C-alpha cells in the first residue's frame, strides 16, 4: 500500500479496523473519518460511500498481487496452476484484514443491496487476476473466464474466511473449483468447435 501520508490509505485502514471491531452495517462514514483522524469533508473528497472504500481497498490488493505475481516464475506452469498461484497470492495479500473481511462479508450477505455495487469492482479484480496468470481477459471468451473465475473466487473466499493458517481447506476448494471451471470452459470450446465445423459443412454444401 501507499505511504503513511496517503489519506486514502489512512481511511481504508480505519474502515477495516472499525469493521473488525463493530461490523460493517452500522459503521458510519463519520466514524471512519474520526478513526482515520481526518475531517468528514476531507474524507468526502476521496470517497462518497463505504462501498467506494472497499473498492479502493480491492484495487490496492490487485496492485499488490500483480506485483507479487510479476516477481514469481509462473510462465512454465499450466494455466490452471498459474491461476491457483495468483489467487493464493491474493489470499496472502488479504490475510492482514481477514478479521475485518469476515465481518464485512457476513453483513453484506444479509444486505444484498449494499453488496450489489461491489460486483463490478470484483469482476475487474478477477480480470486482473487472469492477466496476472497470463490468461487473456478480453472479448467474449475473456468475459466468460472473468465471470467463471469470480464464481471460483467467491466459493474459495467463503472457505478461506473460516480456514486455519495452513489454508489447507482453501487450497483444496480452490483446486476443485478451478478444475470444474476448466472442464466447463473446455466443454464450451468443444461445443463451439463442433458448431463451426457444422456451419462450414452446411455452407460448403449450399
Where are these regions (language model features)?
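Short, hydrophobic secondary-structure boundary micro-motifs
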Residues: 102-104, 117, 138
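Short, basic, alpha-helical segments at the C-terminal edge of helix-turn-helix-like DNA-binding modules
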Residues: 59-66, 73
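Amphipathic alpha-helical packing segments from all-alpha helical-bundle domains
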Residues: 112-135, 143-157, 182
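C-terminal peripheral helix-coil segments that are non-catalytic and often amphipathic
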Residues: 131, 162-206
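Amphipathic alpha-helical interaction segments
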Residues: 10, 31, 85, 89, ...
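Helix-turn-helix
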Residues: 4, 10, 18-56, 60
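Hydrophobic alpha-helical connector segments
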Residues: 56, 70-103, 110, 120-121
